[in-house]
């Protein structure tokens, strides 16, 4: 491997990776084999930063849309008179963006990254337009699904484009900047959503995406001119039928369909239908069949699969997927239900609820900086995984103790602990997966952990909403004047219509319902301890793999 590294570095000069002459003979200078390393295009510094900043803006928009609805859920429940559908506003976006990422990983290897990225951005804008115009809950959910598909190709596309235009020795800084923008967007989404909704209306949370997306498209059209990729590894031109034939549509369809069935079953079971209802049972059965079929299909497809099953032989990679599954759900439980707690229990506005969550924002950003610097010197991941489990478990337990009379100091302190634990856990899942695999498989590492995070978020939100809905529906039995239709009108309506005594009962019930959501976070964070026996305490600094 050392010889390969030396050989590769000898072909790099002035930030441009040169191809051997034999690989460039009789080949159009603007067309490169997709699986070779193309020469980096010569672009000006202004063009480079314009492209990277536009990619960062697109990634920011995609991540922002993932959590911007968190603080809007009370308003949307009142607007659409549909409390039961609240979980789908966030879950369907995560479902579509997560399940399509492996497919987009293949697409970016086969088609022009410029036009595919712009297409994904247009799809995201189209979904935002549908949400902005929605007059009922089903239309809004469809818009979120469309936007999620577009978002699925934006982050992977941004990282792919950076690899095409940035020299290797500078690439980490640029990809880190895009990743940081995505992380910040995920956390401040509720704050921005609250500020926009309180001042100019919640629909502008989606209208505002359109001009930003148009500006990003214009910058890429003007500045970004990548080499075309229409040749096979042997240098023979490929037809579009051959390109399309290399894509695993069947696997993608089975994965998406299975997770949709699981999400519906978790959402409907115990609320809309009984768990023993034939529809719920059928959904669970179909999920099992599709999931097993998808697993077998991925094994059969080998290297052409969305996810090469050979990677599952890597212990460190499996552990990172498990951590991504646990900590992803832990983080989403708070991002979606803390704003609800602040608005329903504390009577905060949407902006106020977002501001109240700033301790979590600061904790996540702070722990990522500290952990990143420390790991760069020590190369040891295991201590931070242990710390993440401890802090996330303790923090989730402390959030579970939230009551209407909890002091502001404790609310802030508990969020700091929770944010540090969940933030460190998600970060270490990505770093661990990349450290566990060969450099050629790093794209699978990031995509796989992102998939686990998204799927964990989908399942967590569905389970939390199931528990939440069952708890608040009990108010119809305790308070004679409260019906399911009344509950669908939202928290503000309850504050204005119930007597002080009745409202006290309602507040306690809502507090218990949100505590149930935090209970899911406790279970997931504590479950991450099951991975401790498989941790590698060796330094990964300078190594290709974390596991032997």
Swiss-Prot record:
Can you name this protein?
A: MFS-type transporter TOXA
What other remark does the UniProt record contain for this protein? Answer: The genes involved in HC-toxin biosynthesis, called collectively TOX2, are organized into a diffuse cluster that spans >500 kb. All of the known genes are duplicated or triplicated within this region, with some variation in copy number and chromosomal location among different race 1 strains.
- PROSITE patterns for this protein: MFS
Q: What is the lineage of its organism?
A: Eukaryota, Fungi, Dikarya, Ascomycota, Pezizomycotina
Q: Which family does it belong to?
A: Belongs to the major facilitator superfamily. TCR/Tet family.
> What are the record keywords, sorted?
Membrane, Transmembrane, Transmembrane helix, Transport
Compartments it resides in: Membrane
What does a knockout show? Answer: Leads to lethality.
Q: Where is the composition biased (Basic and acidic residues)?
A: 14-27
GO biological process, alphabetically ordered:
biological process involved in interaction with host
Decide whether keyword Transmembrane helix is in the record.
Answer: yes
Composition bias of kind Polar residues appears in: 1-12
Q: Write out the GO MF terms.
A: toxin transmembrane transporter activity
> Which residue intervals make up region (Disordered)?
1-33
The membrane spanning regions, by residue number, are 43-63, 85-105, 114-134, 146-166, 177-197, 204-224, 250-270, 280-300, 316-336, 357-377, 382-402, 411-431, 444-464, 518-538
Q: Gene behind this chain?
A: TOXA
Q: How does it sit in the membrane?
A: Multi-pass membrane protein
InterPro entries per UniProt: MFS (IPR011701), MFS_dom (IPR020846), MFS_trans_sf (IPR036259)
Name a GO CC annotation attached to this entry.
Answer: membrane
Q: What does this protein do?
A: MFS-type transporter; part of the diffuse TOX2 gene cluster that mediates the biosynthesis of the HC-toxin, cyclic tetrapeptide of structure cyclo(D-Pro-L-Ala-D-Ala-L-Aeo), where Aeo stands for 2-amino-9,10-epoxi-8-oxodecanoic acid. HC-toxin is a determinant of specificity and virulence in the interaction between the producing fungus and its host, maize. TOXA acts as a HC-toxin efflux pump which contributes to self-protection against HC-toxin and/or the secretion of HC-toxin into the extracellular milieu.
């Amino acid at each position: 491997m050392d010889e390969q590294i030396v050989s590769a570095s000898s072909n790099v000069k002035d930030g441009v990776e040169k191809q051997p002459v034999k690989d460039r003979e009789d080949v159009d200078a603007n067309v490169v084999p997709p699986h070779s390393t193309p020469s980096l295009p010569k672009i000006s510094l202004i063009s480079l930063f314009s492209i990277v900043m536009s990619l960062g803006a697109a990634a920011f928009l995609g991540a922002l849309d993932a959590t911007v609805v968190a603080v809007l859920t009370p308003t949307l429940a009142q607007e659409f008179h549909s409390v039961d559908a609240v979980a789908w506003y966030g879950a369907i976006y995560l479902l579509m963006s997560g399940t399509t990422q492996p497919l987009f990983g293949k697409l970016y290897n086969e088609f022009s990254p410029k036009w595919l990225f712009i297409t994904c951005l247009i799809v995201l804008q189209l979904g935002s337009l549908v949400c902005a115009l929605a007059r009922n809950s089903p239309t809004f959910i469809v818009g979120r699904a469309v936007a999620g598909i577009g978002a699925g190709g934006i982050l992977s596309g941004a990282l792919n484009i950076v690899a095409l235009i940035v020299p290797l020795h500078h690439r980490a800084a640029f990809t880190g900047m895009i990743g940081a923008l995505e992380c910040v967007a995920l956390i401040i989404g509720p704050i921005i959503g609250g500020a926009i909704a309180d001042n100019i209306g919640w629909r502008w949370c989606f209208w505002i995406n359109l001009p930003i997306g148009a500006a990003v498209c214009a910058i890429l059209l003007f500045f970004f001119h990548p080499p075309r990729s229409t040749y096979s590894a042997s240098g023979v031109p490929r037809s579009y039928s051959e390109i399309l034939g290399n894509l695993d549509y069947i696997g993608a369809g089975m994965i998406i369909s299975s997770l949709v069935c699981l999400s519906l079953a978790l959402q409907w079971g115990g609320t809309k239908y009984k768990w023993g209802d034939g529809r719920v049972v059928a959904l669970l059965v179909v999920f099992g069949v599709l999931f097993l079929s998808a697993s077998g299909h991925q094994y059969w497809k080998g290297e052409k699969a969305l996810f090469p099953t050979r990677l599952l032989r890597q212990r460190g990679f499996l552990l990172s997927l498990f951590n991504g599954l646990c900590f992803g759900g832990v983080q989403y439980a708070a991002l979606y239900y803390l704003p609800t707690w602040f608005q329903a229990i504390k009577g905060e506005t949407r902006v106020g609820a977002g501001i109240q969550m700033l301790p979590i924002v600061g904790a996540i950003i702070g722990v990522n900086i500290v952990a990143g610097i420390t790991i760069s010197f020590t190369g040891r991941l295991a201590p931070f995984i242990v710390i993440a489990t401890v802090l996330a478990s303790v923090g989730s337990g402390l959030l579970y103790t939230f009551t209407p009379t909890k002091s502001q100091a404790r609310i802030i302190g508990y969020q700091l602990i929770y944010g540090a634990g969940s933030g460190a856990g998600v970060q270490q899942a990505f770093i661990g997966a990349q450290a566990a695999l060969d450099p050629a498989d790093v794209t699978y590492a990031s995509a796989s952990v992102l998939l686990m995070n998204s799927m964990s978020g989908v399942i967590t939100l569905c389970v939390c909403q199931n528990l939440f809905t069952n708890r608040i529906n009990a108010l119809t039995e305790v308070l004679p004047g409260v019906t399911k239709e009344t509950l669908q009108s939202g928290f503000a309506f309850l504050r204005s219509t119930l007597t002080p005594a009745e409202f006290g009962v309602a507040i306690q019930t809502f507090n218990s319902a949100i505590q149930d959501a935090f209970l899911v976070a406790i279970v997931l964070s504590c479950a991450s301890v099951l991975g401790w026996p498989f941790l590698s305490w060796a330094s990964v600094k300078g190594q290709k793999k974390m596991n032997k």
